[in-house]
From Swiss-Prot:
The lineage of its organism: Bacteria, Bacillati, Cyanobacteriota, Cyanophyceae, Acaryochloridales. Pfam families: AIRS (PF00586), AIRS_C (PF02769). Gene3D superfamilies: PurM-like C-terminal domain, PurM-like, N-terminal domain. InterPro entries: PurM-like_C_dom (IPR010918), PurM-like_C_sf (IPR036676), PurM-like_N (IPR016188), PurM-like_N_sf (IPR036921), PurM_cligase (IPR004733). This is Phosphoribosylformylglycinamidine cyclo-ligase. PANTHER family: TRIFUNCTIONAL PURINE BIOSYNTHETIC PROTEIN ADENOSINE-3, TRIFUNCTIONAL PURINE BIOSYNTHETIC PROTEIN ADENOSINE-3-RELATED. It is found in: Cytoplasm. One of its GO terms (molecular function) is phosphoribosylamine-glycine ligase activity. NCBIfam families: purM (TIGR00878). Disulfide bonds: none annotated. Coiled coil: none annotated. Its main location: cytoplasm. Belongs to the AIR synthase family. Pathway: Purine metabolism; IMP biosynthesis via de novo pathway; 5-amino-1-(5-phospho-D-ribosyl)imidazole from N(2)-formyl-N(1)-(5-phospho-D-ribosyl)glycinamide: step 2/2.
Amino acid sequence: MDYRSAGVDVAAGRAFVEQIRPLVQRTQRPEVVGGLGGFAGLCQIPKGYRQPLLVSGTDGVGTKLKLAQALDRHNTVGIDLVAMCVNDVLTCGAEPLFFLDYIACGRLAPEMMNAVVAGIAQGCEAAGCALLGGETAEMPGFYAEGVYDLAGFCVGVVEQDQVLDGTQVQVGDVVLGLASSGLHSNGFSLVRKIVSDRQLSWQDTPLGPTSLGELCLEPTRIYVQPIRAALSQGIPIHGMAHITGGGLPENLPRCLGQGRSAHLDPQAWPIPPLFHWLGEVGNVSLGELFNTFNMGIGYTVVLPASAVAAAQTCFAKWGIESWPIGTVVAGAGEVLGLPAA
């Protein structure tokens, strides 16, 4: 009897590390010290920071993984994993420095795991952060064969006097909504229930030539480069929110600071057809849709009205549509103007 007969192949794990080494190397930044395979990853703080603060965030992809595994498509969920972490770190104005991943699986399937890590590396490249290290845990008897879970961890850096913490937000500021790429990585338990209860197929094409499964697996948009570009241009951003689980009502107030709310106009941006379709087919109220999904707004920027045009021009250069979707008002941390659940 040996470890391999118990379901853990240490040799396959070592081979996997060698296979992904080129993917990891593509993401490296000048600040990274050493290479892949050590007990820990090392990274310097970039030169030029006066009073650097380290910023950390961790997240997963949720049950979107169930869909990826059902469709045997594994090359995009790694992008989702990075996006969920770096977009969070970005909200306080930080520059993402490095990323760590944790993959747990029933059996290490090299082709599948290579696809996952390729997506993680692609996400890191898009965010400008190094894939500094990770852990792949083979857990037979805990996860079924073909099943895996992902978790990510990101560290960024920001000047202490440039942290966006809500105190800069003022009544009268505009809420600028940046377009999402689709569902992103939230609400998939409801999506899967709708598809299951209505006896639909992920291969169905209710909204055009692209299958429902492909629409839902569209990776989460990474907003790092356009936001960093806006900040470097001196656009006076007062606050930012990553619109994830709980939608706009749950996430927008987190960047407004004390004594402020937001009044939004749900007619101010085009809600993508996928969200309307989910509401109609699943008999989900518009209010519940807003409380569950991003509804086409994946990230919000709060800034003075005088800066809106410059910000929209900046984001458009990165291929991202944006709309003034509301204003900041005095209040107790609420989002007003959206349909009730």
